[in-house]
Structure formats: C-alpha cells, structure tokens
Amino acid sequence: MEERNEQVVEEVKEAQVEEAVTPENSEETVEEKSEAALLQEKVDELQAKLTETEGRTLRLQADFENYKRRVQMDKQAAEKYRAQSLVSDILPALDNFERAMQVEATDEQTKSLLQGMEMVHRQLLEALNKEGVEVIEAVGKQFDPNEHQAIMQVEDSEFESNAVVEEFQKGYKLKDRVIRPSMVKVNQ
C-alpha cells in the first residue's frame, strides 16, 4: 500500500510540473497577474483620490466654520459698538457744553441759565452711559498710553512718578473701546 501511495504522489507532482510548464498556463497566469496588478493600481489610485477629496472636504468645512465664526464676531462687534460714530460726533459738543458751564454766574438770570445747562448736561451724560459710554478717569491715576495722551510733562513731588497731574480734555470709552483718550499732563 505504501508503494501505491508513493506512486500516486509522484504522479501528482509530475502533473503539477507539466501544468506549470505548459505555455497556456503560463500565459493565463501572466494575464491574471497583469490584470490583478492593473486592478490594484486602479484601487490605489481611487484610494488616493478618496483620501485627497476627504482632506479637501475637511478643510472646506473648517474654513466655513471659521467664516461663520468671523461673521458672528463681526456682527456682535457691530451691535456692541453701533453708537460709536454718534458718540464721536457728540463729544465736541459735550466739551463745549462743559466749557460753557465753567463760566461764573454773576446774576440770577445767569445762575438760572447755568442750572438749566447742568440739567441738560447731566441728561446727556446719562443717555451716553445707557449706551455704554464712560468717562476715562485720569487725575491721580497712573499714566496708561491706551487711555491717556500725554501732551505735557512736569516734575511735581506731590504726585507719584508717571502719575497724571492734570487733565486738559476728558477721554471717553464705549464699553471696552477707547473712543477718545484723555489729554493729560504727566509727572516724571
């Protein structure tokens, strides 16, 4: 029986060798291999295009999200600072109002007029405060180049170094944005 098994094994080996050597099988195998290689190349190419398209899509999504965020921030800033133009136009009139109120009243009529001006001034400031306008505090404070504009320097032992000694023109802020810096004299 062992001889029979050995004989069958040898026949199978010979048949395999003959099949491998026949020209028809070798052509089919080469064609199959080249067709498989072409298909693999197509798969690789399509995979690369898919990866590129996915990356482009993700970048476009991120760009769009950034755009939406910028538009939202711009919209909020426009809403927050909508009164800036109006306030900038009103400030010179407010300065003139304050200068007019510094006049000394000598008679009753002038005193009455000044009281009326003070009431109008107070109402104007209240309306500006409702919109978020604040006066920038200056005298006695440390000089801050973001809020103060130094137009003079002086040496005064009564004040700390770099402190605001005198204010020549009031400064104003709208919420957290400086509309006009205070014009001040600074101690060295």
UniProtKB/Swiss-Prot annotation:
GO cellular component: cytoplasm
Subcellular location: Cytoplasm
Keywords carried by this UniProt record: Chaperone, Cytoplasm, Stress response
CDD domains: GrpE
Basic and acidic residues: bias regions: 1-16
Keyword Chaperone: yes
Keyword Cytoplasm in annotation: yes
Coiled coil: none
GO terms classed as biological process: protein folding
A GO term for molecular function: unfolded protein binding
Stretches the record annotates as Disordered: 1-31
Domain of life: Bacteria
SUPFAM superfamilies in UniProt: Coiled-coil domain of nucleotide exchange factor GrpE, Head domain of nucleotide exchange factor GrpE
InterPro entries reported for this sequence: GrpE (IPR000740), GrpE_coiled_coil (IPR013805), GrpE_head (IPR009012)
Oligomeric and partner information: Homodimer.
Family to which this protein belongs: Belongs to the GrpE family.
Function statement: Participates actively in the response to hyperosmotic and heat shock by preventing the aggregation of stress-denatured proteins, in association with DnaK and GrpE. It is the nucleotide exchange factor for DnaK and may function as a thermosensor. Unfolded proteins bind initially to DnaJ; upon interaction with the DnaJ-bound protein, DnaK hydrolyzes its bound ATP, resulting in the formation of a stable complex. GrpE releases ADP from DnaK; ATP binding to DnaK triggers the release of the substrate protein, thus completing the reaction cycle.
Name of the protein in its database record: Protein GrpE
Gene: grpE
